[in-house]
Amino acid sequence: IFKNIKYLDPTLILWRSSSQWIGGLFFLFFLIIIFSNKSFNYKMTNLSFSGESNTNSKENIKDNLLRVLFIYSVLSIFILTLLNISGIRLFNSLNMSMTLVSGGGFLPSDSIEKIISNNFQKIILIFSLLISMLNFYLLFNLFNKKTLVKEHQEDLYLIILSIIFCMLIYFYDYKGLDIVLSVVSSLANSGLTLIKSDNNLSLYFLLITIIGGSLISNTSGIKLTRFYILLKITSLEIIKLISPNSVINKTIFNSDRKISEDNIKISFLIFISFFLSLLILSSLLVVDNIGFEKSFKLSILTLTNTVNSEMYNMHNINFTNL
C-alpha cells in the first residue's frame, strides 16, 4: 500500500519490523507449548521433535520458553551483526534481522535491490530464511549429534527438497544464489526475492509456498510433514491393492515415529480446508474484478501469510484499490 517507504517516519518502519519479530516469537511460544505438552493431545505432537521431556509443570514450561527467547534473541543479534558487517547500514540491518528471524517479508526500503548488493549478503539472507523454516529445536540440538541425526529427519528432508527445487530451475537464466534465495524464501513463506517479475516460474514458486516448512517453525502453508503423510498413505493404499500381503511400513521420514489414524485424518482435514478456503477467497476476489489469475495467486499468498513479490508476477497489483 505504501509507496516511497524512505519517506516514512523511521520509528514507524521500526515498529512494523519489531511487531513482526514479537509476533514470530509468540507464535513459536504457542507452537512449543502445544507440541511439547502431551496433555493437550494435539494430533501431530508425535511427528516432530518437540523437546526431550513433557513440559507438564510450570517450571519446565518457563525454562523452555526462556530458552526459546534466549536463542531467538541471540539469533537476531547474530543476523544483525552479519548484515552490518556485510555493508548494510545499521537501520536496514536492524529491520532486516527482525524480519528474517521471524520468517517475514517486510522491507525497510522500496526494493530489496537497494539493500542487497553482493553475494555475501545473499548468503546471509539464505541462511536466515533457512533457519526460520526448519524446526526451531534444531538450534537447541545443534551440538548434540545423536539427537540431531535421530530426531531431525524432517529438517533433512526440507533441505534436500530445497536442493531439488533449486536444481529443477538451475538452467534458467538466473544467478545461482538468486534461485536458492527464491526457493528458500518460498518454503519459508517470506516472499523475499531478487528475481524479476518477467519470469515464467510464478506458479512454480506458488506451489513451493503452499508446502511451507517444519511443523515447529514460523512458516505457514500446509507443511511438508502433512504432504509426506498424504503421499505415503496414498502410495500404501495403492500397494495394498496391488499386493495385499505386503508388509506396510507407516513410519515417517524413516524414523521410529509411526503415522496414526488421527495423523491421517487431521492431515486430510487441513489439506481439504486449505483448498476450500482458497476456492472461497478466490471467488470473492474475482467478484472484485482483479482477474482470476491475480485472485488465485493473491489467495495463496494470503492463506500462507506470504508477502507479495516480483517472483509471483504480481508487481502491478494496486492494493489501495482492493
What are the roles of these predicted feature ranges?
Residues 1-322:
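Membrane-proximal intracellular helices of multi-pass ion channels
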